[in-house]
Design a protein with these regions (language model features):
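Hydrophobic transmembrane alpha-helices and their immediate loop junctions
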Residues: 1-217
Length: 217
């Protein structure tokens, strides 16, 4: 297992926050960021999934795991929900110790991560709840459309809120559109393969399945 790949990205965040705010604010932000990812890790380990690497990037952390067998989307939803829950715990703590910086940072992280925009936790929470009733592909497609709408709205509002959100919104809109286009391309290839196999083996029953072995949180 390779732990904490991408430390340079985390250092970049730390230095950028020091430049804009101060070192105390930067320490609280990075600590809250790591605490958020730690709660994802705790839930993943509690379900006995194997963690391959933890990758810290400027736009959020990624925990790569290997699933030996399929599992309920509800488990994935709980794992994605664990990160914002960690921020909620720190938010409660901020009221106890009366820390305005801790309160503001974790309130923003809590609300921001629950937005249904890819690659935020809120997006994958919604995908997995919909996947309880719909095929995963269609749940993903619906959520990508929602993600594009929300990211576009955030991009429009960002200049009136904070210019940092302008960069984030642009990034999230880009990956949402890219994933939407890629998923259409993937489905086309899958259907083409199914048609080819059915033509070559007209008497064979074809059951296309997708087994997800590696997930990112």
């Amino acid at each position: 297992m390779r732990l904490f790949k991408g430390i340079i990205g985390l250092v970049f965040i730390f230095l950028a926050i020091i430049f804009v705010y101060d070192i105390r604010f930067a320490i609280i932000f990075v600590s809250s960021y790591i605490f958020h990812e730690l709660w994802h890790l705790i839930l993943i380990k509690s379900f006995h999934f194997k963690v391959e690497e933890i990758h810290l990037i400027p736009f959020g952390g990624q925990i790569k795991m290997n699933c030996k067998k399929n599992h309920s989307p509800l488990i994935d939803a709980f794992i994605y929900l664990a990160g914002p829950l960690g921020n909620a715990i720190l938010l409660v703590l901020s009221f106890i110790i009366k820390s305005d910086n801790l309160k503001m940072i974790n309130l923003i992280l809590f609300l921001f991560n629950l937005m249904p925009i890819m690659p935020l936790d809120g997006f994958y929470i919604l995908v997995n709840f919909l996947a309880l009733k719909l095929p995963y592909f269609y749940a993903l497609k619906i959520c990508l459309i929602i993600s594009i709408v929300f990211a576009s709205g955030l991009l429009i509002l960002a200049p009136f809120i904070n210019y940092c959100f302008l960069i984030l919104a642009g990034y999230m809109l880009f990956i949402s559109l890219n994933e939407f286009i890629s998923s259409n391309f993937y489905k086309g290839l899958l259907l083409e393969r199914i048609v080819d196999e059915s033509n070559n083996n007209p008497n064979k029953e074809i059951k296309p399945t997708i087994r997800l072995k590696k997930m990112l949180y």
